Amino acid sequence: MSQDGTWSDESDWELDDSDLAEFGPVVAVVGRPNVGKSTLVNRILGRREAVVQDVPGVTRDRVSYDAMWTGRRFVVQDTGGWEPDAKGLKRLVAEQASVAMRTADAVILVVDVGVGATDADEAAARILLRSGKLVFLAANKVDGEKGESDASALWSLGLGEPHAISAMHGRGVADLLDKVLAALPNVAESTSLDGGLRRVALVGKPNVGKSSLLNKLAGDQRSVVHEAAGTTVDPVDSLIEMGGRVWRFVDTAGLRRKVGQASGHEFYASVRTHGAIDSAEVVIMLIDASEPLTGQDQRVLSMVIDAGRALVLAFNKWDLVDEDRCDLLEREIDRELVQVRWAQRVNISAKTGRAVQKLVPAMENSLASWDTRIATGPLNIWIKAVVAATPPPVRGGKQPRILFATQATARPPTFVLFTTGFLEACYRRFLERRLRETFGFEGSPIRINVRVREKRGLKRR
């Protein structure tokens, strides 16, 4: 690490091949844009995971999913459309597909039989033949005898038998999977893909730097990064070693607009962002420190709060923040982020690598708080002292009493107070502040539920 707190060699954080071997064989699904790759991935998974729309270029990253077939686990990778002469953003997408070709244990090349073998298909076939990988040719969109005849013409690609399938309707997919898995090493059904890894979701509005941060941490172009807002559509899982442990990062699509206003693949991606937050344990919320806080920031933050996840606020693009902007930002935080004063805060630059290593202790502290349990005895001793010093406000001419307190659950810490009457929201916020002052909980939300007990002898009818 250099003196300014940045990493001089990001490759120190990247998993090598031996680290990744324990997570099972990888099957990459590649091909030109709009040949049905994501539809095939969804068919393999048996559920709608990959974002699908009848428009070329919807999938832009290589996205990994835990899959199972006939009791055997493996990883299936969806990729963006591969084009040999692509430029700009399309070239970056094509590079992701090329990486998948190189790193996977087996490759399924998908070709549209209705179009036939194109120059791009032939170029992909040549690359795959030279790679020495296990390659299976999927002749997609076969729905009848003519399709089967068209599939036979794909022998010309030199990849062996074309497997006639219809990813949309499921035709031939089972036979294809049987042959793919027969060629792969066995993976025990009990193998866990996560292996107990802590799950991290990267969230924030479009173009805030989520993919850039993921790439900086992983040391490679794991997510497609482009100046155009919203270039990440699918959540992208990455296993990254930091601080002596491996973390599972999910790079979520930016929410360009409210879910109700989204359309097409933007809608599905926004739904997937909700899912990524729900499946995570700790969330890194990226905020553009160089610009004023926006309604989009607030909406994404509300999603995290509602999910009850541990939280780290990462103020990105700190290299663009001058002294005047820093003063303005502090006032914005005090005014607009009052509901998450408990969150861990790190000022970073995903572009330069400034202070990104500070994310590790921030996540660890947040997760430790999120996992915390307080024994019932010490909790009730504490609550009695607090109530004696500051009793609950009178309500309806009566002052409610807190009879008993217990922590019902962790993740997030949830407390239940048994009382003789309703506790005002302001008093519950007061109790939360005092809980944090005494027990910490930095980086984790706290939930306080109140249960009003009836008087003894009062029978329900």
From Swiss-Prot:
GTP 1 binds at residues 31-38, 78-82, 140-143. One of its GO terms (molecular function) is GTP binding. GTP 2 binds at residues 204-211, 251-255, 316-319. Keywords: GTP-binding, Nucleotide-binding, Repeat, Ribosome biogenesis. One of its GO terms (biological process) is ribosome biogenesis. Gene3D superfamilies: 3.30.300.20, P-loop containing nucleotide triphosphate hydrolases. The keyword Thylakoid does not apply. GTPase that plays an essential role in the late steps of ribosome biogenesis. HAMAP family: GTPase_Der. Belongs to the TRAFAC class TrmE-Era-EngA-EngB-Septin-like GTPase superfamily. EngA (Der) GTPase family. This is GTPase Der. It comes from Mycobacterium leprae (strain TN).
